[in-house]
Amino acid sequence: MASSDIQVKELEKRASGQAFELILSPRSKESVPEFPLSPPKKKDLSLEEIQKKLEAAEERRKSHEAEVLKQLAEKREHEKEVLQKAIEENNNFSKMAEEKLTHKMEANKENREAQMAAKLERLREKDKHIEEVRKNKESKDPADETEAD
């Protein structure tokens, strides 16, 4: 388009900016369009070029498939590692809980045995004291009977 095809008409002028209108003149029939209306024709490809493009596409597909398989293998390996770690942590927790419970049970058993031994000792002491009191009473009783006569 030439500059004579365009007319500029000023609408407003303000401090914040300027507004204008562009008026395009109608196109003349003689003018040739600046761009082609249809896309450019592609040259005919030879059989070798088509074959090369197909081979390149096949290589891209294979490369993409290999990359996807590699990512899947890495993901599976990571999942196995995470699962193994979880199993190991669970086993460690179970062992620690079992050891703690065993230790607690042993401490309770020892405490119970100590309490039983202390009770038995107190009972023996009471029996001994009762026996002493009985002997003392028996030894005093015959003397009291002879004195009473």
Swiss-Prot record:
InterPro entries: Stathmin_CS, Stathmin_fam, Stathmin_sf. Involved in the regulation of the microtubule (MT) filament system by destabilizing microtubules. Prevents assembly and promotes disassembly of microtubules. Phosphorylation at Ser-16 may be required for axon formation during neurogenesis. Involved in the control of the learned and innate fear. This is Stathmin. The modification Phosphoserine is found at S4, S16, S25, S31, S38, S63. It comes from Homo sapiens. One of its GO terms (molecular function) is tubulin binding. The gene is STMN1. The modification N6-methyllysine is found at K29. Its main location: cytoplasm. Residues 121-143 have a biased composition (Basic and acidic residues). Ubiquitous. Expression is strongest in fetal and adult brain, spinal cord, and cerebellum, followed by thymus, bone marrow, testis, and fetal liver. Expression is intermediate in colon, ovary, placenta, uterus, and trachea, and is readily detected at substantially lower levels in all other tissues examined. Lowest expression is found in adult liver. It is found in: Cytoplasm, Cytoskeleton. Disulfide bonds: none annotated. The keyword Coiled coil applies. The lineage of its organism: Eukaryota, Metazoa, Chordata, Craniata, Vertebrata.
